Design a protein with these regions (language model features):
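Charge-rich amphipathic alpha-helical interaction elements
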Residues: 2, 10-11
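N-terminal alpha-helical segment
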Residues: 1-4, 40
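Major-groove DNA-recognition helix of helix-turn-helix-type DNA-binding domains
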Residues: 12-51, 55-62
Length: 65
């Protein structure tokens, strides 16, 4: 499952601009590891891994909104 900047904004409680910055940074990390990325989206699994978030809680949060 991929999340967009608006989702990142809500999950991390940051501004929209910061949400885009987070996505760009994480996508760059994934590209350096050899993964293909989608501009403006980030896999929820990687977001949770990097920010030490509980993946199930984040998915539940997104499903409620």
């Amino acid at each position: 499952m991929f999340v967009r900047a608006n989702d990142v904004k809500e999950i991390l409680k940051v501004s929209q601009a910061m949400g885009y910055k987070v996505i760009r940074t994480l996508n760059t990390e994934l590209q350096e590891k050899g993964f293909l990325t989608v501009q403006g989206r980030i896999p929820i699994e990687y977001l949770c891994e990097r920010y030490k978030l509980d993946e199930q809680e984040v998915k539940d949060f997104l499903n409620k909104n």
